[in-house]
Amino acid sequence: MGFSTADGGGGPGARDLESLDACIQRTLSALYPPFEATAATVLWQLFSVAERCHGGDGLHCLTSFLLPAKRALQHLQQEACARYRGLVFLHPGWPLCAHEKVVVQLASLHGVRLQPGDFYLQVTSAGKQSARLVLKCLSRLGRGTEEVTVPEAMYGCVFTGAFLEWVNRERRHVPLQTCLLTSGLAVHRAPWSDVTDPVFVPSPGAILQSYSSCTGPERLPSSPSEAPVPTQATAGPHFQGSASCPDTLTSPCRRGHTGSDQLRHLPYPERAELGSPRTLSGSSDRDFEKVSPSEQGPRMPPENCGGSGERPDPMDQEDRPKALTFHTDLGIPSSRRRPPGDPTCVQPRRWFRESYMEALRNPMPLGSSEEALGDLACSSLTGASRDLGTGAVASGTQEETSGPRGDPQQTPSLEKERHTPSRTGPGAAGRTLPRRSRSWERAPRSSRGAQAAACHTSHHSAGSRPGGHLGGQAVGTPNCVPVEGPGCTKEEDVLASSACVSTDGGSLHCHNPSGPSDVPARQPHPEQEGWPPGTGDFPSQVPKQVLDVSQELLQSGVVTLPGTRDRHGRAVVQVRTRSLLWTREHSSCAELTRLLLYFHSIPRKEVRDLGLVVLVDARRSPAAPAVSQALSGLQNNTSPIIHSILLLVDKESAFRPDKDAIIQCEVVSSLKAVHKFVDSCQLTADLDGSFPYSHGDWICFRQRLEHFAANCEEAIIFLQNSFCSLNTHRTPRTAQEVAELIDQHETMMKLVLEDPLLVSLRLEGGTVLARLRREELGTEDSRDTLEAATSLYDRVDEEVHRLVLTSNNRLQQLEHLRELASLLEGNDQQSCQKGLQLAKENPQRTEEMVQDFRRGLSAVVSQAECREGELARWTRSSELCETVSSWMGPLDPEACPSSPVAECLRSCHQEATSVAAEAFPGAGVAVLKPHALGKPWASQQDLWLQYPQTRLRLEEALSEAAPDPSLPPLAQSPPKHERAQEAMRRHQKPPSFPSTDSGGGAWEPAQPLSGLPGRALLCGQDGETLRPGLCALWDPLSLLRGLPGAGATTAHLEDSSACSSEPTQTLASRPRKHPQKKMIKKTQSFEIPQPDSGPRDSCQPDHTSVFSKGLEVTSTVATEKKLPLWQHARSPPVTQSRSLSSPSGLHPAEEDGRQQVGSSRLRHIMAEMIATEREYIRCLGYVIDNYFPEMERMDLPQGLRGKHHVIFGNLEKLHDFHQQHFLRELERCQHCPLAVGRSFLRHEEQFGMYVIYSKNKPQSDALLSSHGNAFFKDKQRELGDKMDLASYLLRPVQRVAKYALLLQDLLKEASCGLAQGQELGELRAAEVVVCFQLRHGNDLLAMDAIRGCDVNLKEQGQLRCRDEFIVCCGRKKYLRHVFLFEDLILFSKTQKVEGSHDVYLYKQSFKTAEIGMTENVGDSGLRFEIWFRRRRKSQDTYILQASSAEVKSAWTDVIGRILWRQALKSRELRIQEMASMGIGNQPFMDVKPRDRTPDCAVISDRAPKCAVMSDRVPDSIVKGTESQMRGSTAVSSSDHAAPFKRPHSTISDSSTSSSSSQSSSILGSLGLLVSSSPAHPGLWSPAHSPWSSDIRACVEEDEPEPELETGTQAAVCEGAPAVLLSRTRQA
């Protein structure tokens, strides 16, 4: 994370960073003392929050997150510690931390795997300048985390057992019971009870008293009254590193309360719990579980917990808990032992960071390690417990409170003097008050004296800062005690059955008309800070009856709902602040909140939806803090619980609300101002109104009405359940069962109709309703509720009537059913009697039927016995096949033939030979009958078919690994060998030669011609070598003889072995560094038709073989079809020849092993490719299924209408291609990873769709950013997806890049020797195809950016490459962006456009048919030359200087291939034209050497008008001295499509000087491609200009270039101008 300062130097900017660092340290040290122990954890969590949510801006993180979080955490700490006033905490950071263990986290624990029952607390951002407390736990589905927002009103009861019970009751899932605590790299699991029970420090008197009683057995106080002065109590099992007294310590009595009073309040610990002394030694049964990455790093050392190690914070001196350190040695033997936090015990490596800046410079990972659960050792606890006896207590005590921290010995008067109204510093009392009540924080000055007298202590009086007060009274504790300890009590937040509501802004939700509200929102947490708070922080049970609220608060009449309405029809709630009730300690925010929620549920739904108007009468008495907190919680929610608040104050009051206040209220200073909102007739007598209202009558009416309504609801539920029980019945089968059902039915109806509640309602309900109508209060609310009760009573009558009717119908059905069952039973009896009578009359027929049944049963039994025998044989065969398949394991060709391998092979061979040979025919017959026992044995057939192959491999591997005379080799065991061959012939498919058809299989192994001498390999169509496979057991010559044209083929094969002079390699596997002219072999050549194609090849024009004595040339480019990109990278066009030569001894076993078995790394790469392919298809289908229908919606924005193809491109076609074709290809290559390259090459054309997609992607992004993101965001929220549509649309581009990486990994592994040359070549070519797709989309976008071009670029062939060059023309230099097409080379000038992509201004272009090239110019290796026709002047020559040698090599290679392809194409067209004109086509040519150039040969095709090398060849070409002379050939070409003759392309090897270019001539008519560099695997396309500023400076300004004739206007001359392709030229 970086900080931005105004000064970039090291002065003020460095000071700003230091001040920011100091401010962050002060804030964190005030929240998490001792900071030396917690710095490692909290600094790293703050660092992660700043990086993830604030873009690394530390200042923004401080103001937007840390300071609001500090206010929320201080409020939480005050509320939690309020009930322990007068006690000194052993861990001063409780409940936020316990020494080094952090309880309330600042960041999400991303790296921790939550288990069911685990949870942790975290403070998060909740909008602008506010924070909230959330509880995070495992979601219901177990796939992520869900969060529960903790309402601010519940902060006082968070660290109690009742809070967790409430959360578990709302979740209705696995109960939460374990809290996660963090300490550096470790995550500890602690029971919630251990976290909620703090540890206290004993006073010296208590320590002496406990020490004096140490000699005897421990004595528990018999009653709370026996407990001594409130000193210290250890309240349960403790955290590691905590200290406690091992002796019996007493618990404090609560000051000013009896025991019965205490036990009423749920958030407080029971008196028995506080009174029972607990020591650390007795708490080992509930120690923490710890999640610690102990395997990956050293455990965090315990930090110094002594008081001397704590650094007081000068800025927050008053907010910091005071340290109590006892150094008196009381004589306890354990006091002289070294405490666990001794600095000498700290390990050398420091895992924490002393400052925020250090954490930035040296970050430490948190939570990313593997979890390991283990119990925390008890020894650390006992060691920590010894320290308390010595008095060496941890440094800080107790919590942040609403008042300032002072010396415990200071008197209240001193406190009063210190905190005057003029003090507004950061340490003032009001700084820790809740953020929610800022708008009511200014107090009237006239009431401060009375408030100070009303408070027990003066340090809560007004004026600490302009905030924290409602109508003049401090929002803090109204019931304070003298500052004897560091704490001050807050009002007791009573958590009843469904306690509190949320005070978090925007999180209150109520939708149930009857009153109950939603449970707290638990949505899957998106794991990022600042997620907007969810809605619905209510407890599940809103009070529904008057008995469910605090009776004392209700009976007091300080909060009433008279039933009046304001001028807009909203219900009015009146609150009086003139009551002693508000000064009592138990007047809590929770009780008032529940009462207001009850009031809100009383009006009808239309009025309830408008919200309440709360009128607070704060005249002559300020409002209590409970009122402000309750109203803030109810107002800041999405559901309109409270619509507005009217605050009636005295006229002399100076109170005004803040503009930035979260609580919005209207301050009125007179009743006349109140009448603007509420009419006087709608106000009670308390507010000088005329509305008649009696609070006692209202309570009585509500009690009677609610009791009656509750009885009606209970009766309705009872009747509905009875009705359901009538409809859920079993179907009886006999008359007896029907009779039992009738009895049960009658009994149930009797019980229902005689129910006491139902009887009383039916008898007395009308009377009760009449009495309620007579006592009706005359308000809208009473009328509405009475009407609702009447409808409930009417519904009871309806339910009774419906039940009686249903019961009567059911009873009639049962009666009919009983009659029918009786009739059926009688019929069955008669049928049985009739059958017995017939059997007696005809016994002979009965005996025959019995005999037939016995015979059939015997046949079934015999068939079952036969099947049992067959199953037994199948079982034995299956075991045999499994044994055979287990032999495959040791036969790994990668394993070296060491002694263990040889021993394993021998044991497998012995096991194989132990199987009787006669067992195989029967097993084979059984295996090969799949219909015998059905489909389940198909796998056994596969295993059986592997047996001969495995047996053969076993013997071969055994003979190679360890030749032993005792083991018979393959040649000495003819029976087994013959059996293997016979099995393979019977059960394997015959060998098939590979075809280049794109629809072929994923891998088709070719067959070696093992019958030939030296095992020559047959070459396929594209120069592919047919690889030897498993079918090497056949005789290939016998197979060839059975094919069409077999005789000629075998003759040629036999002849080739004698004339071959070098071993055969695939062209892709040849060393690429050698010039391709060395592939032209001087050998006797011949032509072989393809065996599987018959006479088809004889008439194909694209395989024309030319034979000459000593020279072999093949041309395959007679058609207009362009070669695929991978063929350009693999080999030049001249390499597609059909030739045979013999390899140099390749062992079949080695070849077979290399092809069948790959390394585990290759299999892993292939598995990753298949798995990611499936995921990629799933993502594309996800977009199609969910986002495509959005474009058909009626509310589609106008900017998106008709833009479906612009946004999504050809995404659907990509999905169909990958799902229907490419995934199947990859799955077929799963066991043969090296064949995956062929799959890519087979679908090269389909991969071109990615170019179209990439070209469309910028338009899609622009449309989404302007219109689509907001529109599709709703669908994303509906799906609950973390990724937006733009992320999914980026997946195709990422997928192509992933293909390139995976292919590179495959190439790296295959180059270790597992792959043959052809497989490596295919993988390299596949990589070229994929990289081309990545680059070509950008190239097409750049092509669209060409401006001012008068040439149709779409007709110039494929764009091959583009780049920036320094172009030299004469003495001028220009920086040009050059585009190279198949038929055109274009020069343009780059023009920068601010805020957009670059555009290219067209300058000039030339047809590639009219240019020649000199490959090297000068000695730099970066320059090459392009020239035109006969170069009459120097301006006809362009020298291009590349930015690197790789770019130059790639361009010269591509241009060379283009020139040669055009020359060969022209030659083929010329030959065909001459043949059609009757001139004839002579396949053979005469090669005549010249006397002057022995190294050159002139090849003439005897065609008329063909120029032959003559004396026109200049001496500078023939006898060059500056460069070595090489053999030259020439190609004659003409363009018959144009009205002019196409110039001849003359390709020479070198020219010695620039002047030699003017004297070039035609060398001949036949040219052979002799490339100087290998095919470049990929062409570099610059995203930015590779030229530095100094190079650009030396390039002259753009001037008008000389007009050059383009290739479309070629001169007509008899000699036909020539174009040279030369090797080198000295600059």
Curated annotation (Swiss-Prot):
The keyword Cytoplasm applies. GO terms for cellular component: basal plasma membrane; cell-cell junction; cytoplasm; cytosol; extrinsic component of membrane; nucleus; plasma membrane. Residues 1161-1340 form the DH domain. Residues 1545-1558 have a biased composition (Low complexity). GO terms for biological process: axon guidance; cell-cell adhesion; regulation of small GTPase mediated signal transduction. InterPro entries: DBL_dom_sf (IPR035899), DH_dom (IPR000219), PH-like_dom_sf (IPR011993), PH_domain (IPR001849), Rho_GEF_signaling-related (IPR052231), SOS1_NGEF_PH (IPR055251). It comes from the Eukaryota. Residues 1352-1460 form the PH domain. Residues 465-474 have a biased composition (Gly residues). The keyword Kinase does not apply. Residues 1070-1081 have a biased composition (Basic residues). Subjects to autoinhibition, mediated by the N-terminal domain. Found in a complex with ARHGEF11 and ARHGEF12; binding to ARHGEF11 and ARHGEF12 enhances CDC42 GEF activity of PLEKHG4B, and PLEKHG4B, in turn, inhibits ARHGEF11- and ARHGEF12-mediated RHOA activation. Interacts with ANXA2; this interaction is required for PLEKHG4B localization to cell-cell adhesions. Guanine nucleotide exchange factor (GEF) which specifically activates small GTPase CDC42 by exchanging bound GDP for free GTP. Plays a role in actin cytoskeletal remodeling in the late stage of cell-cell junction formation by regulating the contractility of actin filaments, which prompts the conversion from 'open' to 'closed' junctions. This is Pleckstrin homology domain-containing family G member 4B.
